[in-house]
Amino acid sequence: MPMSATKAHHHDTIEAAARKPIKERPILFSTDMVRAILAGHKTQTRRIIKPRNNYSIFVGWDDEFVLNDENKEWTLSECPYGYPGDRLWVRETWTKQLSGKYIYRADHPDWELADYTATGAWRPSIHMPRAACRILLQITHIRVERLHDISADDARAEGCTDPGPIAIGEYQTLWEKINGPESWALNPWVWVITFKPV
């Protein structure tokens, strides 16, 4: 079936957006997920879509649209993490030694910091400056789906190591650890971001 004029316009819009100059944006990862990225086990991340007020979600034609419930018009919703080709610089738990060198909890989970750092404590990933970043990722693909649509292969791409369908259960445990108890049951719409190290 041919693409409608409206959807063709949206398709052209996202194609044009993908040709914009490459941008870099920060993204937070937990210590366990940083280790999975460094080990080459994690090449995907799922992030909850936060709809605008009075908007609902529609997915089609491999693009993501939102419907304004007031005027019933579809508009393209930009992924806040960027487009394929854009880069994500990873924020992780970190600190700074008295020498000025940055160190990372993913590398030293049990290290006693008091005698070796300026602050004497690990600092949250949200406070990491760009200068401290050591992991840069390039987005290779973005799609939208319900959380429960994740496949076993995708769960392994998320860094889970259990074989077969068990990987989905492992990912559910990981999701609730990050997003809170019962968050899996909500089955939200999520951005599925596939990436590779730069």
Question: Which residues does each PLM region occupy?
Answer:
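Secondary-structure transition motif
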Residues: 1-198
